[in-house]
Amino acid sequence: MNIQRRDFLISGATALAAAGLPRMARCAEGCCAGPFKTVLKKALIRKRLTPDVVKVLKDNGYPGVELQDKSVTEAEARAARRLAEDEGLRIHSFMGGWLDFNAKDPAKRRDAIEAGKKNLRLASAYGASVILVVPGRVGGIPMPRPSAFKLAYDPKTLMLSRAADADFPAYVQAQNDATKYAQDAVCELVPLASELGVTIGLENVWNNLWVKPDFAAAFIRSFKNAWVKSYLDLGNHERYAPAQEWVRALGDQIVKLHIKDFKLDRAAKNEGAFVRIGDGSIDFKAVRRALECVGYSGWVSIESSGWTDAEHSAIMDRFFSGKL
């Protein structure tokens, strides 16, 4: 760990105070059963905001949208923000996507950081409060199957010593490198995020990193900074641990949510597959209780297919009320 990152990680008292003390990360099953006090808001994901997209949102009861197009100019992003505001809608998040913070080539790591800065500026122009960032990925090396991961790591340094009962030294090294490089990169992005008022939401998207709830939560909390949080996808992690366990572990570090469903099949290559919301293995009633327990109020973007926008809207209403 270099001195700059070490000092950043251990001197975040001001930001930590601003963020407040963590809520209890665990809660008993059966608590928070309702009526719910937390308020969830539904959003669609679209590439750009156009009049046609505005109509879809308003016709189907979506007050917000998450946008994806990184090729727009800041002027175009500001125009989209004006369109949304004129229609009583909110561009709540900007999907910055994959950033190759752990590339072996230092030039590529630098490019990823600069791309992150550009995306932060676009998010600000859109009026989004959060930018979604996937902070690296690993692949092409031997690693455990999803259900076989048993991580052992130093809670202070987050360095992994074991990935599973069997030995996977290449994976352990890759995970440790990814943690260090991601910490370096995100720490460099934080000053701009703070200046712009845009939170960096770190998400796992089948990137084979931070694969257990406690480890992912420790990684997010290592920054000790209010501008670095978790963008949790409720479907991406089911093959590693139930979605409600991810919610409880991440707790008040969750800044935004994606929703999709996943059908477990431990004999399959990926131990399952994505399916329509409601057709999979996720216990959405337990997830809703967990969100209430950790006090999450905020946006939930649909990242799923198989239903119409109107059907998804009705499904979200059922999820929000704890009836899905």
Task: Tell where the protein language model's regions lie, with residue ranges.
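Histidine-acidic metal/acid-base catalytic patches
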Residues: N2-R23, C27-K41, R48-K58, G127-S129, ...
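Active-site acidic/histidine proton-transfer and metal-coordination neighborhood
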Residues: A17-G20, P106-K229
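N-terminal substrate-binding region of glycoside hydrolase catalytic domains
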Residues: V56-A75, M95-D100
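Conserved, mostly hydrophobic/aromatic
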Residues: L57, V65, A84, A112, ...
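Glycine-rich, proline-tolerant flexible connector loops at the mouths of alpha/beta enzymes
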Residues: L67-E85, V138-M143
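Short amphipathic alpha-helices and their capping/turn segments at secondary-structure boundaries
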Residues: E74-D86, K117-S129, P242-D252
